[in-house]
Curated annotation (Swiss-Prot):
Protein name: Cytidylate kinase
CDD domains cross-referenced by the UniProt entry: CMPK
Catalytic activity reported: CMP + ATP = CDP + ADP; dCMP + ATP = dCDP + ADP
Enzyme class of the recorded protein, top EC level: transferase
Family indicated by similarity: Belongs to the cytidylate kinase family. Type 1 subfamily.
Any matching Pfam family: Cytidylate_kin
GO BP term (any one): pyrimidine nucleotide metabolic process
The protein's Enzyme Commission number: 2.7.4.25
């Protein structure tokens, strides 16, 4: 990597709060924001639209190369995502899309195909990269690395609240099982398993408000910036 723009990686399991924290921190710093999970979800959406078989790696790899993904950064409010020119933001956040993205992310060729696409987000004045392997694989030379975590029960509770507020009826125990299953898949995959980088700062977000986590992350940057 020749671009020496600073990078802050924020990794962690689903529901740990990394997306919200990353967006807020990026907006406050005036840095670019990479939601790596949205890339995998976008490929999942494109594969779903094309009615591809998730058990056909070759077809999914072709889909990865053929899918055009555009991010419309919207500050702290969120991210608008276009898949092949179509606004797919809502579909990207469906539970079914998340499960499909997790399965697709386990395919080594897909991860390889998306690696350089993710690294291209590293531009001045800096980048906040949110994902599961940002600090270990995509930006191992990042100057600032954070790993957010929380108990499975805490994360299921957060997701349950989000869905209920949107009018989506869901059973808590079902969400908990899905989160635990996804944790297992992410941790056990052969390529880029979910784990903290050795030099990452670990923050358990259980019972902590978003603003408190944001302040801790910003404080980390302030303490390490000359």
């Amino acid at each position: 990597m020749t671009d020496l723009s600073p990078v802050l990686t924020i990794d962690g399991p689903s529901g740990a709060g990394k997306g919200t924290v990353s967006r807020i921190v990026a907006a406050r710093l005036g840095w670019h924001y990479l939601d790596s999970g949205a890339l995998y979800r976008a490929v999942g959406v494109a594969a779903s639209w094309a009615d591809l078989d998730v058990s056909d790696p070759a077809a999914l790899v072709r889909c990865t190369f053929d899918t055009k993904v555009e991010f419309d950064e919207a500050g702290e409010a969120g991210l608008r995502v276009l898949v092949n020119g179509v606004d797919a933001t809502g579909e990207l956040r469906l539970e079914t899309t998340g499960a499909l993205a997790s399965a697709i992310a386990a395919i080594p060729e897909v991860r390889s195909a998306l690696k350089e696409r993710q690294r291209a987000f590293r531009q001045p004045p800096g980048l906040v990269a949110d994902g599961r392997d940002m600090g270990t694989v995509i930006f191992p030379d990042a100057a600032f690395k954070v790993f957010l975590t929380a108990s499975a029960e805490e994360r299921a509770g957060r997701r349950h609240k989000q869905l209920m507020e949107k009018g989506v009826s869901v059973i808590f125990d079902d969400l908990l099982r899905e989160i635990m299953a996804r944790d297992a898949r992410d941790a056990q995959r052969v390529v880029a398993p979910l784990r903290p980088a050795e030099d990452a700062v670990l923050i358990d977000t259980s019972g902590i408000g978003i603003e408190d986590v944001v302040q801790r992350v910003v404080g980390l940057l302030d303490s390490r910036t000359p």
